[in-house]
Design a protein with these regions (language model features):
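Short proline-rich PxxP-based motifs
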Residues: 84-95
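Structural helix C-cap motif within protein kinase domains
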Residues: 67-70
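Conserved catalytic-loop aspartate of Hanks-type protein kinases
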Residues: 54
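Conserved C-terminal C-lobe helix
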Residues: 96-109
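Terminal C-lobe "cap" of eukaryotic-type protein kinase domains
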Residues: 110-132
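Conserved activation segment of eukaryotic-like protein kinases, specifically the C-terminal portion
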Residues: 31-40
Length: 133
């Protein structure tokens, strides 16, 4: 995605191009929706975006970086919406990655935002703590 930047030392940084909004907590709702359909969480399609919607986008971004392809690449926006709302969440291939990383992505891509971990909880997940993929 256009908002991922890689430094000369290989560090990946996320940018928001000034589109971010500050919310009080992870249950706060956004008043407007802006985003790319390939990264939109189920609740975004139902106009209920929240901070946990970004956790979904993180999971999709990790799959894209790890497998060098977005799981929704080549699909029209309407088909992506149907996939996100009605089909199982995408997953990271377990053949090339640790079970911790596969599990981390799975936690990011829980369909129900109320059940999805928030960023603070994700920081406690094994792969983040051990830094081993």
């Amino acid at each position: 995605p256009d908002n991922l930047f890689i430094s000369e030392s290989g560090v990946i940084k996320l940018g928001d191009f000034g589109l971010a909004v500050q919310l009080e907590h992870s249950c706060s709702k956004r008043n407007n929706v802006c985003g790319t359909s390939m990264y939109m969480a189920p609740e975004v399609y139902e106009e209920e975006a929240c901070l946990k919607s970004d956790v979904w986008a993180l999971g999709i971004s990790i799959i894209e970086m790890a497998e060098n392809k977005n799981p929704f690449a080549g699909m029209a926006s309407v088909k992506i919406m149907n996939q996100v709302l009605n089909k199982p969440s995408p997953s990271l291939s377990s053949s090339g990655w640790s079970s911790d990383l596969v599990g981390f992505v799975k936690k990011c891509l829980v369909k129900d935002a109320n059940e999805r971990l928030c960023v603070n909880d994700l920081l406690e997940v094994g792969v983040v703590v051990t830094n081993e993929c």
